[in-house]
Amino acid sequence: MFLNPVVPNGYYNLRGGAMQSKATPIREDGIYHSFCGLVSVGWLYQKIKDSFFLILGTHTCAHLLQNTLGVMIFARPRFAVSLLEESDLSSSQPDISAQIEEIKREHHPSVIFLLSSCTPEVMKVEFEGLAASVSTPEVPVLFVPASGLDYTFSQSEDSVLQALIPFCPPAPPDDKRVVFLGSVNDAIADDFSLEAARLGIPVAGFLPASHFTELPPIGPGTVIAPLQPYLHKTATQLRNERGCTVLSSLFPFGPDGTRRFWEDLAAQFGMQVDLSEREAAAWERIKHHTDLLRGKKIFFASDTLMELPLARFLKACGAEVVECSTPYINRRFHAAELAALDGVRLVEQANFHRQLRTITETKPDLIISNIITTNPLVGQGTVAKWGTEYCFLPIHGWAGVNNLVTSFTRALQRHARLDPLGSDPIWLTGMMPGSSGGVISLQS
């Protein structure tokens, strides 16, 4: 069943008129995602500094978080896994009250997020009731659906922000300020605050804020400016429940996206700004890197929901985007990005076997792939890099331009330096099971 909303007759463009998009995504039958959404805890617990994230899960969940995030238990991070044991299988509802009290005693959080995982979802644990049973007005416990059965790697942040909406104070209709939507590190947040002040745009804050007690007021006069391309549920809920305006623009990745983002945001406040010189200067600073990317064939096969703006940026750099696949595309929320990707092959839920054939035929210079397929693709001699790292990199706005472009060029330059060593069997021995100096075909 196709669930994404289709907006007839084009999309609303803040610059005026209807914005027609000729980019028509193809829907295939591949997997929805390949990396667990619980890993979003890795950047969210650092962003919301007075929070604690408790995952109800299994030993597999605990191993995933410890190995993926590289945090040892003695570091006392502000997240943990409440392990389900065999005895819990026969109980109607797990008891986490002891863990909640221990978390309050040792970490003193202002809010606790209770995240679901695959096993308790299958067990039909009633998470909302479980969270309500241990929640208090002083320290609310908020249920966050994050099971890998239903959510992509980055979508769990969308669930966390939805849980925070009731705690954002209401703003009066005449309070017209912007709220930046999406988790970015403090340096990037400061850059956006300074740029807004430079342009004369009033800022109410960020969602999520650095502290639970500092959530921004949101009301009918608020302009929501999404920073991340995977937050359409939060944006839709804010528009429906608070009556605020959701900015429809390019996401602030790269000089082109950042310029368009700020110009469209300023237009919401009745200001016309021209940032063409700022954009040109940003392109000039990364000219060495764009020269390397120009003409290169790039293939997106990742699953972070950041693929559309990344592909649009590479297209602006002069690269040839052979294909951009992503778990899903929301035609309304991603309208501006779709319009900018006219002529690029866009695929939802791509069939990986078909992608392998396309990769063999087109021979891309760089593949942005998911965590399952990157190493096997490298083993076949292609240049591939994880798409997951883009969720952790500071690549937003003017301050993030250099980090964004070098994330692509470093992969190409590294391969060029290692290529002379690639024929040595020592690099391939043991890479795939049963392989002695060679690589098992992914199609076998």
From Swiss-Prot:
InterPro entries referenced in this protein's UniProt entry, alphabetically: LIPOR_BchN/ChlN, Nase/OxRdtase_comp1, Protochl_reductN
Keyword Plastid included in the entry's annotation: no
Reaction equations catalysed: chlorophyllide a + oxidized 2[4Fe-4S]-[ferredoxin] + 2 ADP + 2 phosphate = protochlorophyllide a + reduced 2[4Fe-4S]-[ferredoxin] + 2 ATP + 2 H2O
Gene Ontology terms: biological process: light-independent bacteriochlorophyll biosynthetic process; photosynthesis, dark reaction
Keywords: 4Fe-4S, ATP-binding, Bacteriochlorophyll biosynthesis, Chlorophyll biosynthesis, Iron, Iron-sulfur, Metal-binding, Nucleotide-binding, Oxidoreductase, Photosynthesis
EC number(s) from the headed UniProt entry: 1.3.7.7
Co-factor binding details: Binds 1 [4Fe-4S] cluster per heterodimer. The cluster is bound at the heterodimer interface by residues from both subunits.
Binding site for [4Fe-4S] cluster: C36, C61, C118
Source domain of life: Bacteria
Residues passing through the membrane, by range: none
An example Gene Ontology molecular-function term: 4 iron, 4 sulfur cluster binding
Pathway of action: Porphyrin-containing compound metabolism; bacteriochlorophyll biosynthesis (light-independent)
Cofactor(s) in the UniProt record: [4Fe-4S] cluster
Enzyme class of the recorded protein, top EC level: oxidoreductase
Quaternary structure, from the entry: Protochlorophyllide reductase is composed of three subunits; BchL, BchN and BchB. Forms a heterotetramer of two BchB and two BchN subunits.
NCBIfam families on file: DPOR_bchN, PRK02842.1
HAMAP family linked to this entry: ChlN_BchN
Function field: Component of the dark-operative protochlorophyllide reductase (DPOR) that uses Mg-ATP and reduced ferredoxin to reduce ring D of protochlorophyllide (Pchlide) to form chlorophyllide a (Chlide). This reaction is light-independent. The NB-protein (BchN-BchB) is the catalytic component of the complex.
Family: Belongs to the BchN/ChlN family.
This protein's name: Light-independent protochlorophyllide reductase subunit N
Top-level taxonomy: Bacteria, Bacillati, Chloroflexota, Chloroflexia, Chloroflexales
